[in-house]
């Protein structure tokens, strides 16, 4: 497990990461959401042992990461702009990482290169941005590490390739308990892969929640209530947001689905249905309650 406690990093007068507490459990997919400058990259670099915290700590299975060779060998970091050897080829990068990561799976890497139609002997500097991202992901997956830190990894990939990469992650999560930590400015990119999402803003963690819990506890309801009954009359329901269009009432509510249904049915609605919420809608609801406008934070 990765644990950050009071984690802080400053660059001169700028606080890049501001006293963050977070836990990332093994085998889960943790998403970090935030705009550029929110602190995502700095957090990942400290978690991977590249940067030293100014305050607090980040540990992997209770061991400090920075300057700990044994722990760092279990971590692979894919930066927003991946590093490749000057004039190097994909084959050169394979040999390079074989010397760093003992569990690097060269046979799997060669197979994936062919599947992704990436030339092993072609200089990486001639690759497109998307091809470089693909190569970085393949190197990270084949390194055989327990933790994979991905900084805007899906940026530059077309929709088909994004799904292919997500499938690779899912395979390694199931087979060897890989723990990806994925930073992105795009919430939609993470909706179908993450188990847990943290929202970073100005170096602070505004929100950190399990997605299943969020989806189970926030619901959208559309209903038509009997004449004379309005949303203010609904007792026992934690209403986050109300929208009225003619007789159709749309509610965003918090609580257990069955209990909400029971309470609403007691008012004998003319029409009633519960609609699944997207991750974006859930985050908007959660952050509005906390007094933030998420559209200004990540969109």
Predicted regions and their residues:
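ABC transporter nucleotide-binding domains
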Residues: 2-4, 9-195, 199-201
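Short phosphate-engaging motifs
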Residues: 16, 67, 189, 230, ...
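Short, flexible helix/strand-to-coil boundary loops that buttress conserved ligand/catalytic motifs
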Residues: 69, 215-218, 264, 287
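Short loop/turn segments at beta->alpha junctions
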Residues: 89, 210, 275-278
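ABC transporter nucleotide-binding domain
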Residues: 165-255
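C-terminal coupling/interaction segments
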Residues: 252-299
């Amino acid at each position: 497990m990765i644990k950050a406690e009071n984690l802080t990093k400053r660059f001169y007068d700028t606080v890049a990461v501001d006293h963050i507490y977070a836990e990332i459990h093994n085998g889960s997919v943790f998403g970090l959401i935030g705009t550029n400058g929110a602190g995502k990259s700095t957090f990942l670099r400290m978690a991977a042992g590249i940067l030293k915290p100014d305050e607090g700590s980040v540990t992997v299975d209770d061991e400090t990461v920075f300057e700990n060779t044994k722990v760092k060998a279990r971590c692979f970091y894919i930066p927003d702009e991946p590093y490749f050897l000057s004039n190097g080829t994909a084959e050169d990068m394979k040999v390079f990482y074989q010397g760093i990561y003992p569990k690097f799976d060269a046979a799997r890497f060669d197979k994936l290169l062919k599947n992704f139609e990436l030339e092993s002997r072609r200089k990486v500097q001639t690759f497109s941005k998307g091809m470089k991202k693909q190569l970085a992901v393949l190197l990270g997956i084949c390194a055989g590490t327990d933790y994979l830190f991905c900084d805007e990894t899906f940026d530059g990939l077309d929709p088909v390739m994004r799904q292919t990469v997500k499938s690779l992650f899912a395979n390694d999560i199931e087979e060897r308990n890989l723990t990806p930590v994925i930073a992105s400015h795009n919430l939609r990119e993470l909706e179908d892969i993450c188990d847990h999402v943290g929202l970073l803003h100005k170096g602070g963690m505004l929100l950190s929640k399990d997605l299943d819990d969020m989806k189970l506890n926030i619901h959208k309801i559309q209903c038509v209530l009997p004449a004379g009954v309005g949303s203010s009359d609904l007792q026992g329901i934690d209403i986050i947001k109300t929208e009225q269009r003619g007789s159709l009432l749309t509610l965003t509510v918090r609580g257990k689905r069955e209990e909400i249904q029971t309470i609403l049915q007691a008012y004998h609605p003319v029409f009633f249905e519960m609609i699944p919420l997207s991750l974006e809608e859930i985050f908007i609801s959660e952050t509005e309650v906390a007094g933030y406008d998420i559209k200004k934070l990540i969109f």
